[in-house]
Amino acid sequence: MTTTTPDLTIVRAGTLGYEAAWEEQRRLHESVVADERGDAVLLLEHPSVYTAGKRTEPWDRPMDGTPVIDVDRGGKITWHGPGQLVGYPILRLPNPVDVVAYVRRVEQMLIDVCAEFGLVAGRIEGRSGVWVPADDRGPARKVAAIGIRVARGVTLHGFSLNCDCDLTYYDRIVPCGISDAGVTSLAAELGRPVTVADALPVVERHLPTLIEP
């Protein structure tokens, strides 16, 4: 399903393999760079896959030889798969390009989405993504990851929000290169089912905040 407003086209792509999604990102990116179309966001789920950003160290990777796709985003290694909502915003940033400000907008959008479900989440200084703060259940836990690239003033890659995914996939890696914190999901924190289908309309409502006024 595709939703188009004057400022943004949102494409619900369903379940899409990582390589196919990457091809679609690049196609949209070229069109936005060439001014052939406006900003767009792909929303989807991936079949289970590990992807490694440019700062991934050898010891961050799975020890059991599980395949990893190396990608040109920032950050380190992470997992994508069923039960996780992935968003790839393809947006033209205003000049001068401020990547940090854009990442902060993505973080705030996801913080606001979590709040709608009743989960208090926020930032941790020096770490990207959206976090549930440390409490009596354990150390700080990441509920949403962010990995961005900007090429010719237009964004690529994006964010992933853990809804009700199998968190044991993270046990094989050092997720995002951070060994002293955990990973969580909306369902795990709230103690009730929160599916990708539940999260989709909430995320869609908040996506326009990524476009700088």
Swiss-Prot record:
Site (Lowers pKa of active site Cys): residue numbering on this chain: K142
Major subcellular site: cytoplasm
Keyword check for Transferase: yes
Pathway named in the protein's UniProt entry: Protein modification; protein lipoylation via endogenous pathway; protein N(6)-(lipoyl)lysine from octanoyl-[acyl-carrier-protein]: step 1/2
PROSITE patterns to which the protein is assigned, alphabetical: BPL_LPL_CATALYTIC, LIPB
Domain BPL/LPL catalytic: 35-213
Cellular location(s): Cytoplasm
Binding residues for substrate: R73, G74, G75, K76, I77, T78, W79, H80, A145, I146, G147, G158, F159, S160
Domain of life according to the entry: Bacteria
Catalytically driven reaction(s): octanoyl-[ACP] + L-lysyl-[protein] = N(6)-octanoyl-L-lysyl-[protein] + holo-[ACP] + H(+)
Cited SUPFAM superfamilies: Class II aaRS and biotin synthetases (SSF55681)
Keyword Cell cycle recorded: no
A single BP term in Gene Ontology: protein modification process
InterPro entries: aa-tRNA-synth_II/BPL/LPL, BPL_LPL_catalytic, Octanoyltransferase, Octanoyltransferase_CS
GO MF annotation terms: lipoyl(octanoyl) transferase activity
A cellular component annotation (GO) from this entry: cytoplasm
Active site: C176 (acyl-thioester intermediate)
EC assignment: 2.3.1.181
Known role: Catalyzes the transfer of endogenously produced octanoic acid from octanoyl-acyl-carrier-protein onto the lipoyl domains of lipoate-dependent enzymes. Lipoyl-ACP can also act as a substrate although octanoyl-ACP is likely to be the physiological substrate.
Protein name: Octanoyltransferase
Organism: Salinispora tropica (strain ATCC BAA-916 / DSM 44818 / JCM 13857 / NBRC 105044 / CNB-440)
Source lineage: Bacteria, Bacillati, Actinomycetota, Actinomycetes, Micromonosporales
Encoding gene per record: lipB
